[in-house]
């Protein structure tokens, strides 16, 4: 069972964007950072374990040549082997900051030359893979940035061309030294998934076709791809082959966020039906097939959810954001 803990107030509310919550745990400092997007700004908050807000500040998208301020599409902390960077994407470009958000170390402007006059230009979908940070774009390309151990000498090292539709989300997991391992998956507005092997050069391993609905959120855990779709379903695929093992009718409306507690294999799903569910993923020791068990369901009444994240790697607490909701709601197990 989970209970509603003390909420963390926001200055505004959360924009109606999928995956609109990022969480960074800082156990050494007994702090948790939260990041939420609202229009042209991103709100960064730090809170003590009891949910007591300690600090709050705003980041704004870098101005371009346009008349109106650019809208932010996502904010996400990327945990690299040697540093943590905060990445902010917008309709203008990609901004990278030190983890506290005070120092910008890199700016990449989006090239709108290939876009048609009626096509929106934006970046969306952020994940760290080794010493790389991968960011999706409106064109379907994934930009791969090589991150140094310190300093601002960040380099765009590669562009991955597996998609024809805008990227929605990217998920990664450590490769753990295995050969030919599938350690990154990208999703797009058509529901297509591309599975990659990271490295000095990223390699496309397989494509998992869509079926007419977008895939707003995707996660990867021990070779299992969890994909949340616009029809409320969660699909579990074998990453190396792309084979579908499990199909869950998880929500009555579109899924807006997935997250994984990596230590225990718990999957968090949030949908526009106001529900949050927790699932336990595992493999049958004899057949190797993927299995799933429903652990918990929570209704956040009268709220269009748009973000959900575990607050710890063991899945004992989670937080959610909602459109027009001026707080981050926290839940913990009892």
UniProtKB/Swiss-Prot annotation:
Alphabetical list of Pfam families matching this protein? WDR54
The listed outcome for residue 107 to A is: Decreases cross-linking
Domain of life per record: Eukaryota
Subcellular location per the Swiss-Prot or TrEMBL entry = Vesicle; Cytoplasm; Cell membrane
Single GO MF descriptor? protein homodimerization activity
Does the record carry Cell membrane as a key word? yes
Annotated keywords: Cell membrane, Cytoplasm, Fertilization, Membrane, Repeat, Ubl conjugation, WD repeat
Effect the entry attributes to changing residue 280 to R: Decreases cross-linking. Abolishes ubiquitination
Its primary localisation, in coarse terms, equals: other
Gene Ontology, cellular component aspect: cytoplasm; motile cilium; plasma membrane; vesicle
Q: What is known of its domains?
A: WD6 repeat is required for cross-linking by TGM2.
**The protein's role, per its UniProt record:** Plays a role in the adhesion and fusion of the sperm-oocyte membrane through its interactions with IZUMO1 and IZUMO1R/JUNO. When cross-linked to form dimers and trimers, it has a regulatory effect on ERK signaling pathway activity in response to EGF stimulation. Colocalizes with the EGF receptor in WDR54-specific vesicle where it sustains the internalization and controls the degradation of the EGF receptor after EGF stimulation.
Protein name as annotated:
WD repeat-containing protein 54
